[in-house]
Amino acid sequence: MGKEVFLLDDQGIKRALTRIAHEIIEKNKGAKDIILVGIRTRGVPLAKRLAQRIDQIEGEIVPVGMLDITLYRDDLTKDENDPIVHGSSIDSEINDKIVILVDDVLYTGRTARAALDALVDLGRPKMVQLAVLIDRGHRELPIRADYVGKNVPTSKEEIVRVSLMEIDKKDSVMLEGSKNVV
């Protein structure tokens, strides 16, 4: 069994999100026409935090929605019990808007692909971008994040564990099962 390696604490997460917020504003020449959409579960509080940072920096309130990709996943089988669907909630019109999908960890790209499929069912954005707190590599699909808090090279056996105050009562990112020190 490998070690548990500490990657980010609450201040590290805060700095990463602040940097991503600045990058979003810079790339999109402001915050106009942007909608942040968090992928359930941990993408939602991250999207809300990003919206707060953008408002602090730019003085513009960015709408935040949540996307449930459960029925769009390609790893659900007919043999599984009924999946729990929480539903999506995007109160703003996404047509002709810049939608930034927000998630905690980018790994194979399959979650991002499912989110794109779910998003297209809700409308036709002008552009879709992807923001992630952690990019751990090992893509199985041609997907990359536009905004990354931290790149963490991992083995496929390792697990990146993101804990957020809103869900887990603490902010941290840990690498579990590591044989090396990061």
Curated annotation (Swiss-Prot):
Keywords: Glycosyltransferase, RNA-binding, Transcription, Transcription regulation, Transcription termination, Transferase
Gene3D superfamilies: 3.40.50.2020
Catalytic reactions on record: UMP + diphosphate = 5-phospho-alpha-D-ribose 1-diphosphate + uracil
UniProt short sequence motif PRPP-binding, positions renumbered to this chain: 99-111
UniProt-listed SUPFAM superfamilies: PRTase-like
EC number: 2.4.2.9
EC category name: transferase
PANTHER family: BIFUNCTIONAL PROTEIN PYRR
Protein name (Swiss-Prot/TrEMBL): Bifunctional protein PyrR
Gene encoding the protein: pyrR
